[in-house]
Amino acid sequence: MRSTLLTLAILLSGTFAVACGDASSKSDEEVEREEIQVMLETYLPLLAQAYSTGQYSALEPYAAQKEISSIHKRVQDLTVQGRRLEATLRSVTIEDIKAWNYSNAYVTTHEVWDLVVHATGSDQVLAEEYEQPNRVKYQLKRGDDSWRILFRQIQE
């Protein structure tokens, strides 16, 4: 009887250890999701500001130079067309995260934006769309305990 109780105690402690191990890995995933959510909630208003002002330096802690260069090109293309974009982020929700090797991730988000296109150099409104939903795919890289955007693409 005593050996049965000892065996049962060992089995229960092993089950508890395995359960705790699974809980901590889920906790790591939740922490990762929160880190990415906070980063995107910080970055996206700065992205909107870059489109409005043409100032990109605030993006540097969050996006790789290649991504900043592609944003710069899009803003230049709008300028050539005589347009300036004023964007306001309404919400961002992470739909999916596929992470690998601790330092890489693909993230899919659902973002809602208010977009107003002005004629360059004036407040004349050329187009406006409020509460525009977008599904966006990001490629992220972790470095120095923070995530950076390597690539951002609107899916729909």
Predicted features, each with a name:
Residues E41-T53, R90-T109:
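N-terminal short leaders/motifs
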Residues V38, T42, L46, V80-E86, ...:
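Repeat-unit-sized solenoid/scaffold elements
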Residues C20-I68, D77:
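Short, low-complexity N-terminal intrinsically disordered segments enriched in polar/charged residues
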Residues I10-S13:
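Residue-level signal for mature regions of secreted extracellular proteins and peptides
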Residues M1-L8:
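Bacterial N-terminal signal peptides that target proteins for export
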Residues Y56-Y102, V117:
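Short solvent-exposed beta->alpha transition segments
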Residues Y102-E156:
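Exposed beta-sheet edge and beta->alpha loop/turn motif
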